[in-house]
Amino acid sequence: MPTTIIHSDDAFTTQELVFRANDTNRFPAVRTPLSSIFEVENISDRAASIDVEAATLPGLTDGTWGEVLPMSQVNRERKNFALIPPKVGKLFNVKLDEIQSVRQTATVTRESLQSVQDRKMGQVFLSLEDFHERARLQGILGRVINYAGATLYDLRQAAFFDTEPNPVLGLELDAANPAPGALRLKLAALTRSIEDRLQIGQNTPTGYDVQANSDLFDLLRWHPETMEAFKRWEDLARPEGSPLVPFRFAGFDFHDYRRTGLASGRAVVIPRGVPGMYKTIFGPGDFMSVLNQPGFARYVSVEDARHDKGFEYEVSTNPIHMCNRPEAIFELDAGAGDNDTNP
């Protein structure tokens, strides 16, 4: 059967390819250090409308039993802004020699063509996931980026959340004679500062992840205070324990972040458990057959290559990764810190 006839099959329409690409049984989601903390939202509009107060609890009013509660007095208009998701993707070709090699009894079946297609799609999906992870880290730090790493939106600016740059707390891990308990005191003050910024009682974190550049991770792992804590923790005190495994100290879970995006000697503190604090928004695809539908994580379309020399595929995604409470995100520095932050 000629490949052009197979390719006109309903299985190769844009809509069916999109459903196939987002089938998690066929293409399982890749777990990354930051993927689990982001809530996913799918929108059908070209722009995402962001409510600045979406991650805060509403105020209450006093009333009289037996009467309707009075309307709350609003002193200012609710602030919203719009973000347009960037399109990121890749073109790839399924060439004649790739199809020729999977022929079965001189014919090309739908399944054999799909096997070549799925293999190449899977490779592109891994590249997309690498971009998503970079964009998640920058989203936590208050920036929406494109694939090249350029900042499309700095959400800390006045037009958006109107917050100051991320405070940088210096841990002074390289101090020659650190005072006993000094590191714990710094981290305790950091905890209070984050909780104050999140309005403790309304948004209380359930924990803190620290994704650290390897330099900071190693300095902290072998810091005198940390080593003293390990002596009381039998499993990590054993010689065969890996020095690269995550560890908990002073209420923070420290991880050796092996991905790109963190400068040497730097770390980012990520509060966990605050509903709606981290969001991934997938915008709609730019194909007629999926117009006005909620956005998918992956889009795929195909057309015949020029002069009948194979098939050309486009794989794309339209994501925004963002943090709704950028004022509560702190960075750590192994030295004194950039701005001498003292929570």
Q: Language-model features: where?
A:
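Sequence/fold signature of self-assembling virion shell proteins
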Residues: P224-P343
